Amino acid sequence: LPDCQGWMIAKCRFSLGNRKMKTSDQFPLQILKKDGRLAKIHICSFAGEEKDLLDVTLINPGQRMTLGSRENMETEKEDYPFKVTREETDRYLREVKDQNPIHQGEGAIVPGFLMANKILKQLSPQIPFQAEFRFLTPLQIERSGWLEFLSSDEENDPKIEAEKALKKVQKIHLRTPQNIILKAEITEYKE
C-alpha cells in the first residue's frame, strides 16, 4: 500500500493448496481495516475446492521502533543459524519492487516477507500447508540470529496424538541474544 511506507508487518498468515499457480490467477486485495496505526489486508484466490490466501496486519511503528543492542548481536546458536545479508535483501527488494524506506540504507531492517520466505525455504514444508508469523522486533540486515524449534507441551495428550495423523505442526522462534524477533507456526496437512 503506497500510503503505508515505513510501516512494518506485525503478523501474516497464508495458506497454500495443492494446485500450481498460474500467471492468470487473480488475487483481489481487500482492506479490512485501516487507520493511522494499523492496516489489515486480506488477499484470497479460489480455484475449485482449493483456496490460497494471505492475511497481513501492518503497523505504523512511529518513533517507537526499538532494535535492541548491537552488542553481542553477532553471537548465534550453531544448530540453526539465521542471517539475512545485504545482497539477499537488495535482490529481494528489486524483485518485489519494495521501496519502503525502513528497508533502505544504514541500519535497515529485513523485510518481514523475506524472513518468512527464508524460514519456509529452510523448512521445506509439504503442500498443502498454512503458516502464521508474528513479528515482535525488527531484525537489522546482516545481524545474526538462530531458529529455535519448540516442543509441544501436550506430547502425551490423546487428542493431540490423533491430530498428528492429520497434520504436522512446527512452532519456531527466530531469536537473537537480546530478543525474540518472530514467532512462527507452520502446519502441514497430511493427505
Residue ranges and their predicted role:
Residues L1-R19, G62-Q130:
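Hot-dog-fold acyl-thioester-processing enzymes
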Residues D3-P81, L139-E142, E148-E191:
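HotDog/MaoC-like acyl-thioester-processing domains
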Residues F129-A131, R143-G145:
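Short beta-strand or tight-loop elements
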Residues F135-T137:
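Beta-strand-rich interaction surfaces with strong enrichment in secreted/lumenal proteins
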